[in-house]
């Protein structure tokens, strides 16, 4: 065996375990009210570092600093007054009056920047890239799973998307599922409810999950 062929064999051998690795999660689902089969395949779960920018996008903004006390009247009041006006930035920036960034826009940016962790496949050739994948034990022996796709579910199959869509401008979709030990359960999505930050569990979530309509019937 020559040196170059030995190196090639070594590189291929290193790559084989990654290719042959089992997905962290594989589920099958059907959209309710439509004969639309879906396959959910998660290669791996998000790391804390990968989830952090998306959680930060929905975190409450930090409290604004208290304004400085007005200068006391006296001999130096004139100089103090001029300094105060200059500090505001006048015509230049209007610093304190700037509108806070839109949480939806921040989350969209964070989703796009995240690595692809899997796909949700429909009956076509185009899948939905999964950019966020989290799971934890839930009630009654079930597992809670939260996924975020970069594109809106149903973007290429509008016939099965429930109407009205709560956030029609959102490019991504948050999918939250509850499944039992056999992989049977339900899934709901941000197509019909809003996205929230579950601060206790430290994950993205659906606001009012229990009241949201079921979008997916899930099986293993």
Segments predicted by a language model, with ranges:
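N-terminal targeting signals for Sec/Tat export/insertion, comprising classic cleavable signal peptides
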Residues: 30-53
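Solvent-exposed loop and beta-edge segments used for protein-protein assembly and interaction
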Residues: 19-23, 34, 124, 139-141
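Disordered, low-complexity segments in secreted/periplasmic proteins that are enriched in proline
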Residues: 63-102
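Bacterial N-terminal signal peptides
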Residues: 4-17
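Compositionally biased alpha-helical segments
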Residues: 52-59, 96-98, 108
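Tryptophan-anchored aromatic micro-motifs
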Residues: 21-36, 108
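Mature extracytoplasmic/lumenal regions of exported proteins
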Residues: 108-220
């Amino acid at each position: 065996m020559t040196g170059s062929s030995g190196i090639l064999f070594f590189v291929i051998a290193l790559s084989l375990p990654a290719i042959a690795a089992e997905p962290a999660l594989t589920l099958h689902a059907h959209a309710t009210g439509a004969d639309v089969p879906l396959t959910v395949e998660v290669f791996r779960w998000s790391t804390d570092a990968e989830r952090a920018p998306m959680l930060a996008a929905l975190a409450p903004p930090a409290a604004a600093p208290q304004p400085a006390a007005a200068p006391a009247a006296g001999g130096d009041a004139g100089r103090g007054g001029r300094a105060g006006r200059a500090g505001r930035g006048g015509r230049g920036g209007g610093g304190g009056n700037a509108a806070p960034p839109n949480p939806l826009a921040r989350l969209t940016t964070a989703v796009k920047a995240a690595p692809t962790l899997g796909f949700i496949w429909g009956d076509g050739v185009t899948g939905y890239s999964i950019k966020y994948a989290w799971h934890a034990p839930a009630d009654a022996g079930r597992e809670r799973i939260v996924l975020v796709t970069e594109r809106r579910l149903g973007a290429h199959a509008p016939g099965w998307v429930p109407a009205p869509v709560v956030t029609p401008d959102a490019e991504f979709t948050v999918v939250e599922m509850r499944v039992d030990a056999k992989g049977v359960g339900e899934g709901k999505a941000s197509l019909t409810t809003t996205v929230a930050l579950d601060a206790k569990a430290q994950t993205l979530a659906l606001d009012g999950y229990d009241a949201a309509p079921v979008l997916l019937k899930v099986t293993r």
